[in-house]
């Protein structure tokens, strides 16, 4: 039988891997052809560097999360895992921030810069991007909870000795 703390950690890691994998799949499959004033164009995630960064960052975090699932519980390398959890949480924060900024401009445009919103013409694409961002945010929140749980688990024995 697993200890409750280990079970919680495993459950959070499974949720995080699922959410990052979903974010990658949803964003990587987002594309739609649209027409604007008789001009045809195709909206793809690869057209936007921030969306490419989002996919790459989430893919890296997915692989990391999957590998950590098989890490033995009693290993002394858990300190390294704790540090890497922090690094990958920051990677998720930066990629989601960049993608959210671009998505906001795509949805609302920017009147001062003369950028028109595109979501009215490519709604399926925008909905997929929104879904990927929601999955990414779920992964981020899960990683933050996991990080706090790991820090507490790591520091608790030290605090009890003091």
Curated annotation (Swiss-Prot):
The keyword Cell membrane applies. Residues 28-49, 101-130 are extracellular. Keywords: Cell membrane, Membrane, Transmembrane, Transmembrane helix. It is found in: Cell membrane. The keyword Glycoprotein does not apply. Its main location: membrane. Residues 1-6, 71-79, 152-162 are cytoplasmic. It comes from the Eukaryota. One of its GO terms (cellular component) is plasma membrane. It is a multi-pass membrane protein. Pfam families: CASP_dom (PF04535). The chain crosses the membrane at residues 7-27, 50-70, 80-100, 131-151. Homodimer and heterodimers. Belongs to the Casparian strip membrane proteins (CASP) family. This is CASP-like protein 1C2. It comes from Populus trichocarpa.
């Amino acid at each position: 039988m697993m200890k409750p703390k280990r079970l919680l950690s495993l459950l959070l890691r499974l949720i995080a891997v699922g959410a990052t994998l979903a974010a990658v799949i949803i964003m990587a499959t987002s594309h739609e052809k649209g027409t604007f004033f008789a001009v045809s164009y195709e909206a793809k995630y690869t057209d936007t560097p921030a969306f490419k960064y989002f996919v790459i960052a989430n893919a890296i975090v997915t692989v990391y999360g999957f590998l950590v699932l098989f890490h033995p519980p009693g290993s002394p390398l858990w300190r390294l895992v704790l540090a890497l959890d922090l690094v990958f949480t920051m990677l998720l924060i930066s990629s989601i921030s960049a993608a959210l900024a671009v998505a906001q401009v795509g949805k609302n445009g920017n009147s001062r810069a003369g950028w028109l919103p595109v979501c009215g013409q490519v709604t399926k694409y925008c909905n997929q991007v929104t879904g990927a961002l929601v999955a990414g945010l779920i992964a981020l929140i899960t990683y933050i909870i996991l990080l706090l749980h790991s820090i507490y688990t790591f520091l608790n024995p030290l605090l009890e000795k003091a």
